[in-house]
């Protein structure tokens, strides 16, 4: 096994244990408002600490980029661990059992390893660049549909940028003319993994951060899917808007959503 993958799995499982225990004791949860509609809990922070501890034991010089602490610079800035210690915090707070740990390892700007762990279902999604994607050691492949007919798509709402809601609804209105249904599940990392597993047929969202999607991005691509921004480019880790699906479905989604894009997205 790739040594960094092994450490990423160890870190994800340790963080998952922290989250699962915290989920059982939500009466003790401490919640803080970070910004509009955006919360952080003591479990987010404890999960992050568990991940950092595992990484630092094996790779003390690597740079770590996390949702809660930002960039923790190491001597080796070429290798970056991009972490969301609890993707789906709102679900966690509300008692909805759908959230995950997301860990990506990027080497000189390219994602080499992706790990997403769902501690409630004990599902471990992994990928190494060029070696395929797996769930609990079983190979993953995207659902290779030819068009949008009968597809179920997952998305998220730009709750931190509510000015984008009209565009979001316009995109959904165009897509529902051909697809079967939507799901809004609340964890971008798991949305991407579910695309890779064929549980949903595609995913699109605006306003996500690199730590939400870096691991899931690789998992989709290694499962035979395509990930791009709303213009068909590769800037999604920085722009925060993306589409993920089998290649033909990505093309169909782009054809539907591009007429709805506001000027700031037409670049």
UniProtKB/Swiss-Prot annotation:
Its main location: cytoplasm. Mg(2+) binds at residues 67, 84, 86. One of its GO terms (molecular function) is inositol monophosphate 1-phosphatase activity. One of its GO terms (biological process) is phosphatidylinositol phosphate biosynthetic process. Its cofactor is Mg(2+). The keyword Hydrolase applies. Substrate binds at residues 67, 86-89, 183, 212. It is found in: Cytoplasm. Signal peptide: none annotated. GO terms for cellular component: cytoplasm. It comes from the Bacteria. InterPro entries: IMPase, Inositol_monoP_metal-BS, Inositol_monophosphatase-like, Inositol_monophosphatase_CS, Inositol_monophosphatase_SuhB. It is an enzyme of class 3 (hydrolase). It catalyses: a myo-inositol phosphate + H2O = myo-inositol + phosphate. Keywords: Chaperone, Cytoplasm, Hydrolase, Magnesium, Metal-binding, Ribosome biogenesis, RNA-binding, Transcription, Transcription antitermination, Transcription regulation. Its EC number is 3.1.3.25. CDD domains: IMPase. Homodimer. The rRNA transcription and antitermination complex (rrnTAC) consists of RNA polymerase (RNAP), NusA, NusB, NusE (rpsJ), NusG, SubB, ribosomal protein S4, DNA and precursor rRNA; S4 is more flexible than other subunits. Belongs to the inositol monophosphatase superfamily. Part of the processive rRNA transcription and antitermination complex (rrnTAC). The complex forms an RNA-chaperone ring around the RNA exit tunnel of RNA polymerase (RNAP). It supports rapid transcription and antitermination of rRNA operons, cotranscriptional rRNA folding, and annealing of distal rRNA regions to allow correct ribosome biogenesis. This subunit may play a central role in organizing the structure. NCBIfam families: PRK10757.1. This is Nus factor SuhB. It comes from Pasteurella multocida (strain Pm70). The lineage of its organism: Bacteria, Pseudomonadati, Pseudomonadota, Gammaproteobacteria, Pasteurellales.
